[in-house]
From Swiss-Prot:
Residues 1-66, 227-275 are annotated as: Disordered. The gene is HSFX3. Residues 49-60, 228-242 have a biased composition (Polar residues). It is found in: Nucleus. This is Heat shock transcription factor, X-linked member 3. Residues 29-39 have a biased composition (Low complexity). GO terms for cellular component: chromatin; nucleus. It holds the Pfam family HSF_DNA-bind. Residues 79-182 bind DNA. Gene3D superfamilies: Winged helix-like DNA-binding domain superfamily/Winged helix DNA-binding domain.
Amino acid sequence: MASQNTEQEYEAKLAPSVGGEPTSGGPSGSSPDPNPDSSEVLDRHEDQAMSQDPGSQDNSPPEDRNQRVVNVEDNHNLFRLSFPRKLWTIVEEDTFKSVSWNDDGDAVIIDKDLFQREVLQRKGAERIFKTDSLTSFIRQLNLYGFCKTRPSNSPGNKKMMIYCNSNFQRDKPRLLENIQRKDALRNTAQQATRVPTPKRKNLVATRRSLRIYHINARKEAIKMCQQGAPSVQGPSGTQSFRRSGMWSKKSATRHPLGNGPPQEPNGPSWEGTSGNVTFTSSATTWMEGTGILSSLVYSDNGSVMSLYNICYYALLASLSVMSPNEPSDDEEE
């Protein structure tokens, strides 16, 4: 019975009160609480916990958010860089544990599995490289001139990769400008081989200049022929003149002198090549009739030559006036 009474009294103490007064179970003053401070201490701890939780939630997120914003901006700027500069930046930073420099600082050591999880599997704004495959990443290393090496003093570890490049060194970012993709070098080489196009233009211009040179040379040859025609005709005319003079001398010795007037030829003989012979023959006949030829031949042969020269040059002057395409009298007949 005593135990039942004590249990009822304990339940009455734990029951909630309405309006600040306890429910059934006896007056409050009849059964005092043996531990009056225990409930208050518990309530205070709960209140402190509730007061600390909102404060901690309000104070911690701004720092985390700012740090995340900074990381997102850094990753975004890092994504815009070239492949060698991206790799050099993450190797220089201590936050990435999957990549590091060797002791000499001229090669990069990559942990395959950790690098796959830490770097290549980044998504969204935190992404660094365009590819998420380790095979594609290794292909990029080869395209930019990185060579795979193995340390001689340690056994081969399949999880570790070591790549080196003469322009990829620790604390030397300026050397990164010398690293170029092999495709770009190939394109520049192809452009260098395509340079001979201007030579074709030069060849075309040379052919044209040769053709112009031949045309000009032909014109100059024609001019020289035209200028040299009188000199060529001169000796021939002189020869014909000499022949005609000799013939006239022979005719003067053969035929006696007469006093008849000079006779005109049957047809016009002042044009063409036949004019020389006709003119000389008529002049000879006229001089034979007047008796001038005999005196000239026997007295002074030089005066006869001068007379024939005058007649010859007069004939050449008259013939030069004619056009070369004008037909002669013989052709018309």
